[in-house]
Each structure stands twice: as structure tokens, then as C-alpha cells.
């Protein structure tokens, strides 16, 4: 059997949504690529929206297109500090 080729996995930010599950992704290195949703994400009905951080798999042959393989969880929202500690009685 033929060995599968290793692919690059990079992270980026979804900047635009296009029809048919295509997205414009701004990679962390500054490059912009066109990403499409992988089959597992499509089957599990995971929503990808503008502003989401994703992992995208790029081939060595075409660095302008890639497959979105994972949507990263959003960063935790910091809790506001309690005002009870600051009040003077």
C-alpha cells in the first residue's frame, strides 16, 4: 500500500463565510487560505462561524486551500471581581 503523505496542521481565524461550507481563514502566520469543512465536522453538524478559531490541514502541493479539521473552543470569559471586597463599612 502507498503511504499517506504528511500534511501541515496550522491554526487560524475564520474571517468570511462562503456558500457550500467554504470559509476564508486568516492563518497565524498572516497567510489567507480558503478552507472547507471536513466530513466528520459536517456529519456531526458542528457550526463554524465568523470569528471562530480553527485548525486547518494544508497539503504541500496547494497552500491556498485546506480542510478545516477542528474548531477550537472559545477562550474562557474572565469573571468580574467582587465589589464586596472593595467596599468600606
Swiss-Prot record:
Q: Does the keyword RNA-binding apply?
A: yes
User: Where does this polypeptide localize?
Assistant: Plastid, Chloroplast
Which Pfam family is an annotated match for this chain, by its short name? eIF-1a
Q: Which residues form the S1-like domain?
A: 1-73
List, alphabetically, the SUPFAM superfamilies matched: Nucleic acid-binding proteins
Name the principal localization, coarsely classed: plastid
Q: Which PROSITE patterns match?
A: S1_IF1_TYPE
Q: Name one GO molecular function term.
A: ribosome binding
Q: Which InterPro entries match?
A: NA-bd_OB-fold, RNA-binding_domain_S1_IF1, TIF_IF1
- rRNA-binding listed as a keyword: yes
Q: What is the annotated quaternary arrangement, including any partners?
A: Component of the 30S ribosomal translation pre-initiation complex which assembles on the 30S ribosome in the order IF-2 and IF-3, IF-1 and N-formylmethionyl-tRNA(fMet); mRNA recruitment can occur at any time during PIC assembly.
Could you say which protein family the record assigns here? Belongs to the IF-1 family.
Q: What does the protein in this record do? A: One of the essential components for the initiation of protein synthesis. Stabilizes the binding of IF-2 and IF-3 on the 30S subunit to which N-formylmethionyl-tRNA(fMet) subsequently binds. Helps modulate mRNA selection, yielding the 30S pre-initiation complex (PIC). Upon addition of the 50S ribosomal subunit IF-1, IF-2 and IF-3 are released leaving the mature 70S translation initiation complex.
Q: Can you say what this protein is called?
A: Translation initiation factor IF-1, chloroplastic
The taxonomic lineage of its organism, from the top, reads: Eukaryota, Viridiplantae, Streptophyta, Embryophyta, Tracheophyta
Query: What gene, per UniProt, encodes this protein?
Result: infA
